[in-house]
Amino acid sequence: MANCAIVGINWGDEGKGRMVDLLTEDYDVVVRFQGGGNAGHTVINEKGKFALHLLPSGIFRSGVVNILGNGVALDPENLWTEMQDVMAKGVELTPENLKISDRASLLLPWHRDMDELEEMRLADKKYGSTKQGIAPFYSDKYQKKTILAGELFYSEELKTHLADLMEWKNLTLTKVYGAKPYTMAMLEEWLETYCEKIKPYICDTGIFLKDAQSNGKNILFEAQLGSLRDLDYGIYPYTTSSNTTAAYAPIGSGLPSAKIDDVVGVVKAYSTCVGEGPFVCEMFGNEAEELRKNGFEYGAKTGRPRRVGPVDIVATRFGVEAQAATTIALTKLDVLSYMDKIPVCTHYLLNGMQTDRFPFPSALKNAKPVIEYFDGWKCDISGARSWDDLPKAAQEYVTFIEKQIGCPIKYVSVGPERDSIVIR
């Protein structure tokens, strides 16, 4: 048995979904262990192009069991909508290949309202939320003010619990934000429309995972976002509200005894960021727009233009350490093929001193990038399938990043399709 975690090294949007889709050929189970509908894992295969938000990226592989673990922000409305979308494209989803932990907490209708209302209140001080209710959800979870998925099987207790939560939440909605209150009729409609649809998929996934582990099954843990958005290790407060690191995978999946054998850290060949907060190596103007256009850098969930810049060695090295990555997948190398000279942020200039260490979040606003330039290769590399197929300049770019971040780059993605990959 071998267990693997696929995690983001930077701000998210690195290409984790395409790597999960590729590597699930060797795994029996795929588990999403944190985050919620704010994710956007893009997968392109023979069935089309998919932007997965809650569903694990292993759903396209026959024989793979996909699990939403207890650490996930389980949004029944978004999940059921997403399930319908992928099933309409010929993807089979049954309780045999998709299982939802009965210990996952439900993202309730007012969580999205609270998210949007708080961003409106913050105005120009906003965090850049996707407005999917993630921060209010996790806040309520740690206050023990949510519903567990398993409670859907206990209707009377569920309605009493919901009524108590509604009374409490309506105080905040009406008194703090001046918004309309919820009614039980609204919540009962939500239960019927969405929760009843996902109910057949809810079970004790902890037992399933323990059995899988005992029987020598290979388990892949799929993370959302990246190291720099981790609640504890990221650029606080411009983080998500969950732990995005591989170390959290056993807890959030429901298999605390799991040993992670390999951690594949996914790094984009340049930097992108959605949302607010410090982004030291950010490009602006025409240079940024050209990179954004060539990489099609728009949020899979929000459609927002992503902030872009050169690969940031300082931030990436920090991300590798936070994830304890054992190997790296470098994605979207092909996007840089238009550049004559390729910029790389190798150090930061902070308080008149050059540093290669990622600083405390409060210091980042004063950091300036130190840029080196590498020769571009100026040719189409999307057909490369072996290391020798890549031009020398591309090889030098990859090996420089590898040396600087201190972790071997095993996979190099040269296109969005499943087979557009170089394995070293």
Feature locations, PLM:
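Non-transmembrane, aqueous-exposed alpha-helical and coiled segments at domain scale
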Residues: 1-424
